[in-house]
């Protein structure tokens, strides 16, 4: 994938960049793997706003992704590499030998016509899925399960990857993209390789309207609100915060305040905390 630049024909185009979509092989998704996706605009079942900055955007359909990779021993051929509006990574359509079709996250280097496998007999090749106990130390992986059989939950975004660092009893040490080193059960599955579309982070949206096409609404500063809307609101002119530290709209400390639950049950699985930004 390469980044496409535009001539500054308008102010919105001046710094705008996009993907050239060179890896995409079709624009028509597999109909049997599509599901309707209703827009919620950040509202819950009572119609109350629970997530800010959501609303509008282009109409989408959900692509059913196989995060479990449990078609053991059945070869699958990569039919297409496709764009997915619901995630930063591209997806690959897999045609299995028994006739079933599934979408998976497209790994970097995965090509149309390539054959992939799942299970203990699979080779250590890009796109193959195995249990962590069967993956050699030093291997780069993605789409990692946290509970056996639940499906991949970690390392699914464009360009991300994790590395197998070692094995200790029934656990495997994994270094995640953030730098955190974590113990994960050896019977959990992961897919070999790095997630593709790695230049996604270099894309410059360029103008506010393009954010709106993606369903993102504006973020308003608390300092320009009224005091009944935000702890930073009110005052005459450009007033200071008036508190010891910045606050969230709900009165909780923010910008550096630790929100992780103390004595979290999963603390025992974290060997080293993530890198500080």
From Swiss-Prot:
| Region spans: Disordered | 24-55, 221-277
The answer, when asked if Nucleus is one of the entry's keywords, is no
Superkingdom per UniProt = Bacteria
GO CC term (a single one): large ribosomal subunit
Keywords from the UniProt entry: Ribonucleoprotein, Ribosomal protein, RNA-binding, rRNA-binding
| Role noted for this protein | One of the primary rRNA binding proteins. Required for association of the 30S and 50S subunits to form the 70S ribosome, for tRNA binding and peptide bond formation. It has been suggested to have peptidyltransferase activity; this is somewhat controversial. Makes several contacts with the 16S rRNA in the 70S ribosome.
Similarity-based family:
Belongs to the universal ribosomal protein uL2 family.
Q: What name has this protein been given in UniProt?
A: Large ribosomal subunit protein uL2
């Amino acid at each position: 994938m390469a980044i496409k630049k535009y001539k500054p024909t308008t102010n919105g185009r001046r710094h705008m960049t996009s993907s050239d979509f060179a890896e995409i092989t079709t624009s028509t998704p597999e109909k049997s793997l599509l599901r309707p996706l209703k827009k919620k605009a950040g509202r819950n079942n009572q119609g109350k706003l629970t997530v800010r900055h959501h609303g509008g955007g282009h109409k989408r359909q959900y692509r059913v992704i196989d995060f479990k990779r449990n078609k053991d021993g059945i070869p699958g051929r990569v039919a297409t590499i496709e764009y997915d509006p619901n995630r930063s990574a591209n997806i690959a359509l897999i045609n299995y030998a028994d006739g079933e079709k599934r979408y998976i996250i497209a790994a970097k280097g995965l090509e149309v016509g390539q054959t992939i496998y799942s299970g203990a007999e699979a080779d250590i090749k890009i796109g193959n899925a195995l249990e962590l106990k069967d993956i050699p130390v030093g291997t780069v992986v993605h789409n990692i399960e946290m509970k056996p059989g639940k499906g991949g939950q970690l390392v699914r975004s464009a360009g991300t990857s994790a590395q197998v660092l070692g094995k200790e009893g029934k656990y495997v040490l994994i270094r995640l993209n953030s730098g955190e080193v974590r113990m994960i059960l050896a019977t959990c599955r992961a897919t070999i390789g790095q997630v593709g579309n790695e230049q996604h982070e270099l894309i410059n949206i360029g103008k506010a309207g393009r954010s709106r096409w993606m369903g993102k609404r504006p973020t308003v500063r608390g300092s320009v609100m009224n005091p009944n809307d935000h702890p930073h609101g009110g005052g005459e002119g450009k007033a200071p915060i008036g508190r010891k530290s910045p606050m969230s709209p709900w009165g909780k400390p923010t910008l550096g305040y630790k929100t992780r639950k103390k004595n979290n049950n999963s603390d025992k699985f974290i060997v080293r905390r993530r890198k500080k930004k």
